[in-house]
């Protein structure tokens, strides 16, 4: 019996067998990603695809400064509002920045025809040449060119008028009919502006133009309109009971424009030869100008990013990421990050059979941990790690390249009477934006799922590689580990890792040790059976003796009466 118990104790005190385990990298990363099936999966490495930061400033775009209108809007700038005169010296810009509530626009009250279309045209212009289309001193010898000023357009507390237009009035009691033409010989589109004055009463009409019935005619190859003054009493705006309506047209190279009038003409003085640029645009922003450069400008501020998506603003100018409504777009490049819990061993659950990663393995994604008489240590499997890195890097670069179509996205212009069209356009834009956002999020979810499955597969493949080499020279003990039936020194361990393990060399030793272990198991089973029988008999005897003692005690004090009948 003593011999059997000694064998049992020897079997229970396990020997320090040589082992090798397959595992994967873990670290202290807190990055989380979403997949199709899971949310907030902690991973070792990931890349962000969504830019959400900006500098809050207006910057030069590719080294070219913007045209910052300040207190002026597009109308005030292009007509030449006296308060905007300083802007007329600008000849080129990267984009135009307008404030939301600019003060200086049309100074003499009236309507600007097709103003939203003009803004749209100017949004693609990156430079222009301002020139006298009809020189002031020589073009109107029979009309007064100095009296046409108004307090509504005052500057430095003096009455003034637009710097690109001339208000022609009677001279010496006459307003002769006029006819002026211009041929565009500049090989560029030319923007021509003019106006028509509508007095509030017939007396003003006679005083300014010496006739009650007047007209203005403007004709080109693509434009043909005749205007008549609308004389009517109106409420004063900026102290003026009269109105001026403003008009514009684009004159193609070689085209001719003809002005005819016998009164009420606000004549062109300066025109603009336009040069269009693909990266220009108009933004409405309260951001201030700063000494900075950027490739992408938004109304909120400049973005300096090579990421494919941004959630800062839908209006962008330059080479900009695509706007989406997402709050998180992070693509996994590493593995699930599940550092092993020491009380549960070295591993946790990846690949379905390993329960955690190794923070001690820092030079690769997948690898080995071995233990033998010479010590223990971690070693990465460089080949499988490098193949995985190359594959995932190529995939991430491909996704970014395909989705990173950088472009300018400017807002569309609608006037107050086009509210239904504006609302419809907003719904269409929102629909496209929802589709873009959905596509971006779905792409990231699918790729994250595939990447984690890819890592899972690589760990399994590494495990199978070791298993196929060792065959029955070692046994699987769970958690991705194998216990050798033979002594495996460092040279032996290295051969397992690099795939050159010599199975026949160790098979005889393994066979003998396997037989010994199996014998110990059988002997242990016999000992366990003897102990079980002994324990059962001893327990039964103790129970019977206890019952007898209790019965004797109860009979002696009368609590239990015993009758024996024959």
UniProtKB/Swiss-Prot annotation:
Question: Per the record, what ranges lie on the membrane's Extracellular side?
Answer: 18-529
* UniProt keyword list: Clathrin- and caveolin-independent endocytosis of virus by host, Clathrin-mediated endocytosis of virus by host, Disulfide bond, Fusion of virus membrane with host endosomal membrane, Fusion of virus membrane with host membrane, Glycoprotein, Hemagglutinin, Host cell membrane, Host membrane, Host-virus interaction, Lipoprotein, Membrane, Palmitate, Signal, Transmembrane, Transmembrane helix, Viral attachment to host cell, Viral envelope protein, Viral penetration into host cytoplasm, Virion, Virus endocytosis by host, Virus entry into host cell
Q: Which cysteines are joined by disulfide bonds?
A: 21-481, 59-292, 72-84, 107-153, 296-320, 488-492
Residues covalently joined to lipid (S-palmitoyl cysteine): 555, 562, 565
Q: How does it sit in the membrane?
A: Single-pass type I membrane protein
Q: InterPro entries, from UniProt?
A: Capsid_hemagglutn, Hemagglutn_HA1_a/b_dom_sf, Hemagglutn_influenz_A, Hemagglutn_influenz_A/B
SUPFAM superfamilies, per this entry?
Influenza hemagglutinin (stalk) (SSF58064), Viral protein domain (SSF49818)
Q: Please give the residues the UniProt entry marks as glycosylated.
A: 27-28, 40, 90, 144, 286, 304, 498
Provide the site residues for: Cleavage.
344-345
The entry's cellular-component GO terms read:
host cell plasma membrane; membrane; viral envelope; virion membrane
State whether keyword Chloroplast applies. no
- What about PTM? Palmitoylated.
Signal peptide start and end residues: 1-17
Subcellular location field: Virion membrane; Host apical cell membrane
Membrane-spanning residues: 530-550
| Cytoplasmic topology ranges | 551-566
Q: Which GO terms describe its molecular function?
A: host cell surface receptor binding
Q: Name one GO biological process term.
A: clathrin-dependent endocytosis of virus by host cell
Role description: Binds to sialic acid-containing receptors on the cell surface, bringing about the attachment of the virus particle to the cell. This attachment induces virion internalization either through clathrin-dependent endocytosis or through clathrin- and caveolin-independent pathway. Plays a major role in the determination of host range restriction and virulence. Class I viral fusion protein. Responsible for penetration of the virus into the cell cytoplasm by mediating the fusion of the membrane of the endocytosed virus particle with the endosomal membrane.
Similarity annotation: Belongs to the influenza viruses hemagglutinin family.
Remaining remarks: Major glycoprotein, comprises over 80% of the envelope proteins present in virus particle.
**Self-association and partners:** Homotrimer of disulfide-linked HA1-HA2. Interacts with human CACNA1C.
> What's the protein called, per UniProt?
Hemagglutinin
Q: From what organism does this protein derive? A: Influenza A virus (strain A/Malaysia:Malaya/302/1954 H1N1)
């Amino acid at each position: 019996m003593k011999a059997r118990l000694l064998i049992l104790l020897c079997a229970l005190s396990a020997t320090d067998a040589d082992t090798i385990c397959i595992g994967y990298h873990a670290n202290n990363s807190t990055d989380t990603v979403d997949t199709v099936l899971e949310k907030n999966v902690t991973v070792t490495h990931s890349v962000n695809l969504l830019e959400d930061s900006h500098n809050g400033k207006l910057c030069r775009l590719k080294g070219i400064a913007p045209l910052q209108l300040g207190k002026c809007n597009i109308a005030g700038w292009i007509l030449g509002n006296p308060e905007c005169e300083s802007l007329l010296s600008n000849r080129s810009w990267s984009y135009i920045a307008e404030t939301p509530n600019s003060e200086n626009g049309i100074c003499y009250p009236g309507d600007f025809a097709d103003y939203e279309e003009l803004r749209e045209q100017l949004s693609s212009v990156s430079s222009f040449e301002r020139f006298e289309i009809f020189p002031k001193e020589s073009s109107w010898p029979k009309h007064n060119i100095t009296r046409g000023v108004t307090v509504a357009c005052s500057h430095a507390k003096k009455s003034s008028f637009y710097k690109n237009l001339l208000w022609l009035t009677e001279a010496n009691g006459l307003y002769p009919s006029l006819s002026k033409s211009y041929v565009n010989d500049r090989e560029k589109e030319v923007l021509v502006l003019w106006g028509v004055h509508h007095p509030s009463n017939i007396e003003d009409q006679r005083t300014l133009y010496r006739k009650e019935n007047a007209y203005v005619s403007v004709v080109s190859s693509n434009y043909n309109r005749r205007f008549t003054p609308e004389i009517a009493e109106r409420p004063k705006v900026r102290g003026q009971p009269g109105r001026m309506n403003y008009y514009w047209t684009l004159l193609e190279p070689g085209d001719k424009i003809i002005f005819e009038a016998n009164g009420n003409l606000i004549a062109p003085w300066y025109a603009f030869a336009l040069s269009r640029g693909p990266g220009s645009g108009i933004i409405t922003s309260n951001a201030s100008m700063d000494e900075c450069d950027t490739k992408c400008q938004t109304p909120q501020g400049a973005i300096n990013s090579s990421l494919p998506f941004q959630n800062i603003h839908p209006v962008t100018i330059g080479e900009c990421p695509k706007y989406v409504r997402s709050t998180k777009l992070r693509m996994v490049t590493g593995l699930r990050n599940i550092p092993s819990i020491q009380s549960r061993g070295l591993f946790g659950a990846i690949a379905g059979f390993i329960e955690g990663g190794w923070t001690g393995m820092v030079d690769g994604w997948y690898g080995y941990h071995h233990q033998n008489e010479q010590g223990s240590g971690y070693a990465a499997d460089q080949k499988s790690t490098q193949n995985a890195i190359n594959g995932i890097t190529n995939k991430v670069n491909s996704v970014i390249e395909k989705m990173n179509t950088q472009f300018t996205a400017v807002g569309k212009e609608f006037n107050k009477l086009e509210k239904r069209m504006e609302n419809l356009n907003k719904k269409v834009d929102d629909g496209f934006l929802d589709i873009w956002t959905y596509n971006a999020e779905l792409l990231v979810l699918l790729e994250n799922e595939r990447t984690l499955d890819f890592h899972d597969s690589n760990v399994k493949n590494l495990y199978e590689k070791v298993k196929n080499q060792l065959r029955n020279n070692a046994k699987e003990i769970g958690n991705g580990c194998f216990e050798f039936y033979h002594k495996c020194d460092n040279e032996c361990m290295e051969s397992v890792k690099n795939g050159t393990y010599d199975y026949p060399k160790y098979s005889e030793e393994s066979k003998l040790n396997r037989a010994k272990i199996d014998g110990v198991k059988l002997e242990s089973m016999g000992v366990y059976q003897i102990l079980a029988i002994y324990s059962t008999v001893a327990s039964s005897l103790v129970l019977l003796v206890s019952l007898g003692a209790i019965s004797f005690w109860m009979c002696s004090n009368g609590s239990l009466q015993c009758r024996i009948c024959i």
